[in-house]
A protein has these predicted regions:
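Alpha-helical transmembrane segments of multi-pass membrane proteins, especially transporters
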Residues: 21, 25-33, 52-60, 81, ...
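Membrane-helix interface "capping/anchor" motifs
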Residues: 16-21, 70-82
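Short glycine-rich loop/turn motifs that provide flexible caps or phosphate-binding loops at active sites
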Residues: 6, 10, 21, 31, ...
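Canonical alpha-helical transmembrane segment with a positive-inside/aromatic-interface signature
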Residues: 100-144
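Alpha-helical transmembrane-segment detector that highlights a single hydrophobic TM helix
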Residues: 47-70
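Juxtamembrane membrane-interface segments at transmembrane alpha-helix termini
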Residues: 36-44, 67-71, 92-102, 115-127
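Alpha-helical transmembrane segments and their membrane-interface boundaries
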Residues: 1-54, 101, 121, 139-144
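Small-residue-rich segments of transmembrane alpha-helices in multi-pass membrane proteins
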Residues: 28-38, 60-63, 84-97, 138-143
Length: 144
């Protein structure tokens, strides 16, 4: 339940901004990662199960989900923040699965703060072409 709730918090921000990986996606990624991690810790399995190998496979699987969210349109690359959010949602689920509840809650708060508060700062200082110097040459302005 904790992993699901943490995924919902991150997914809520993504959903609010209209990104494709929203509430359901982030909640499922966090809950699934927690479940796989927790299953690896059950001592009753007939074979020896290494939880770190399960964690590595979670990271690999989530990498495919993240890669699917990244789109390139000309020189514009979209979806990197969503891909990173998917990656973090999985790590939060794994942290909860390993029993690091407070770490997962703390990181979730930090992630939501970064997603919500840095967007206006980034747009103001780094993406506004109106504030660039006239002598700055952009790649699309170079002579052919």
């Amino acid at each position: 339940m904790i992993a699901l709730a943490l995924g919902l918090l991150i997914g809520g921000e993504r959903e609010f901004r209209g990104h494709p990986a929203g509430l359901r996606t982030m909640a499922l990624i966090s809950a699934g990662s927690c479940m796989f991690t927790g299953l690896g810790l059950i001592p009753e399995f007939p074979q020896n199960v290494d939880p770190t190998r399960i964690a590595a496979q979670i990271v690999t699987g989530v990498g495919f989900l993240g890669a699917g969210s990244i789109l390139r349109q000309g020189e514009l690359v979209r979806g990197l923040t969503t891909a990173a959010s998917i990656w973090v949602a999985a790590s939060l689920g794994m942290a909860v699965g390993f029993g690091y509840y407070w770490l997962a809650v703390f990181v979730t708060v930090l992630v939501v703060v970064v997603l919500v508060s840095l967007k206006p700062f980034e747009e103001r200082f780094f993406r506004n072409r109106a504030h660039r110097r006239e002598t700055d040459v952009q790649p699309d302005e170079l002579p052919q």
